[in-house]
Amino acid sequence: MFRLEFISPLGVFDSGLGGLSVLREIRREMPAASLHYVADSAWVPYGPRGDEFIQRRSLALAGFLVEHGADIVVVACNTATAAAVPLLRQSLDLPIVGMEPAVKPATAASRNGKVGVLATVGTLQSARFAALLDQFSSNIEVLTRACPGLVEQVEAAALDTPRTRALVEQYTAPLLRAGVDTLVLGCTHFVFLRPLIEAVVGPEVTVIDTGAAVARQVRLVAGCLEATGDRAGGVEFWTSGDAERLAAPLNALWGGRVALNSLPGEYVGQSA
């Protein structure tokens, strides 16, 4: 059996810093794994962008990770998963692990059959999400809410400011009035707002995200690779955005001081 400190790195990308919530769970699940993370912060948020643009960016970012040795690519973004994972799987000869809003576990957790989903416009309008609802919502009522502005708050590491709290209250209020007892965080950025969201919705509402489940899936896909070793694996970070400006939010969200590298120009893209 191989030891993770000697294998190729696992590659992870997101529209920005939200995917760090998934990276954190992967590191917890596979502490000896070498990890490479790319934040496409020049183009965040993906939510309002078209599928073709997201597909181009996803191919570029996955290509960068493969060029740097990744043998598994994790799309730590619900919007990019919905728009680009089928194309990535057609284009790349390696495992691709994506995100999926936790509608299935939410249906099991709900006591009254009313589930709320907070996500981006891109995720909520995708065929993938529609298929997910068709599959799991026959016996429950699913209420959705797009959340413009929340991704940007997380990108700034503004996790509990008056502005962020006001947005969370605005987006959860109609779901609470409708009586949801289970709330799905359908965007990896929103996981960083979980303490605030739980404080706003109260203890009677169960909040669910899929980060830990995705990390377990990554370990399963890794197959014969051990999840432990003699030392912790390294983590390297890149961004298409302004690395100097993003360093402070990255350190705040990751929980430690790390180096942030700039993507080479050919991977940054020119226009939306």
Please annotate each region the language model reported:
Residues 1-272:
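Non-catalytic structural scaffold of enzyme domains
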